[in-house]
């Protein structure tokens, strides 16, 4: 597995569909201002700098998580934090690209 695949930048369409079939929650890790300028309907906004402090609340959702942001870099970081805390998650990449996969 290459570095980009490890960070979640491979072909995601199949994985996104599998996660959504399991009732995944989409967490947009952009800033509140970025989120307000446009986002995926039904997604939750938890900025990247708040992810670590929200782990318990995210675990209580008992759902897989698809993290997204503007380009995929911040969601890649969020994905690693979530995985390191035992949460089933994936990097959904940029929110506009992810929206087209739903």
Predicted feature locations:
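Rhodanese-like catalytic fold shared by cysteine-dependent sulfurtransferases
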Residues: 2-15, 22-24, 32-63, 73-102
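Short cysteine clusters
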Residues: 69
């Amino acid at each position: 597995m290459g570095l980009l695949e490890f960070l979640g930048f491979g072909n995601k369409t199949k994985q996104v569909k599998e996660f959504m079939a399991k009732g995944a929650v989409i967490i947009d890790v952009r800033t509140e201002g970025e989120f307000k300028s446009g986002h995926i309907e039904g997604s939750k906004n938890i900025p990247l700098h708040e992810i670590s402090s929200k782990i318990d609340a995210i675990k209580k959702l008992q759902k897989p998580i698809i993290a997204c942001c503007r380009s995929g870099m911040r969601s890649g970081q969020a994905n690693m934090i979530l995985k390191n805390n035992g949460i089933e998650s994936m990097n959904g990449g940029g929110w506009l690209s992810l929206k087209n996969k739903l």
